[in-house]
Amino acid sequence: AGSYALTGSYPQVRAWQQATAQTPGLLARALDPQAQPLNEEEMARLALGLRTRLQNDAGNVEGWLMLGRTGMVLGNAGTATGAYANAYRLDPKNSDAALGYAEALTRSSDPEDNRRGGELLRRLVSRDHTDIRVLSLYAFSAFEQQRFDEAVAAWEMMLKLLPAGDARRAVIERSIRLAQEK
C-alpha cells in the first residue's frame, strides 16, 4: 500500500480532490469583478472542479457556460467547444450559450466547425440584428472566411448602433476599409 502512494495515481487523485474542494471559492473569485483575477493554474483547477460538478449536474446551463469561458481563457478549444455545445443544447435561446458556442466553433482549426459557427452566427444576426456582440463576432468571422461583403455589412450595422463618441468606431471604420480593399 505504501508503494502505491508513491508510484500510483494518488498524487493525481489528491490534486483532483483539492480542485474539487476549491471550486466554490475559485468560482466566487472568478465571478467577482473586485476580486483578484485567477491565475492560469487556478483557472485549470476551476475547470477540473467544474467538470467534476457537471458530471452530477449535467443540466446546469450556467455551469457549462462557466466551463466554456474557462476553456476559452485557457486556450483549450475542446473543453470550450464541448461545454458551450452542452449549454446551447440545454438552452438554445440563451444568448450567452449560443454566442459562446458560435465563437468556439469559429475559432476552431476544423473548417467544418468554422462553417457551423458561421451558420449559427447568421441565425443569431437574423434573430437580433441589434446585438453588438453578435454583430462583432459575425463580422470578424465573415472577414476571416473572406466573405468581405458580409463583414462590411455587419460592421456598418454596428456603426449605426454605436454612439458617436464610442472608441470602437475607429476600429470598425478601419476594419471596413481593410475589408473593402480585399
What residue ranges belong to the model's regions?
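Long, contiguous interaction/recruitment modules in multidomain scaffold/adaptor proteins
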Residues: A1-L48
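Alpha-helical adaptor scaffolds
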Residues: A30-N39, M43, V61, M66-V73, ...
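Alpha-solenoid helical repeat scaffolds
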Residues: L48-R51, A85, R122, E156
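Structural marker of alpha-solenoid helical repeat scaffolds
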Residues: N56, L90, R127-D128, L161, ...
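TPR/TPR-like alpha-solenoid repeats
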Residues: T70, A104, S141, L161, ...
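Register position in tetratricopeptide repeats
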Residues: V73, R107-D110, E144, L178-K182
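TPR/TPR-like (Sel1-like) alpha-helical repeat modules
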Residues: F143, F148-D166, R174-R177
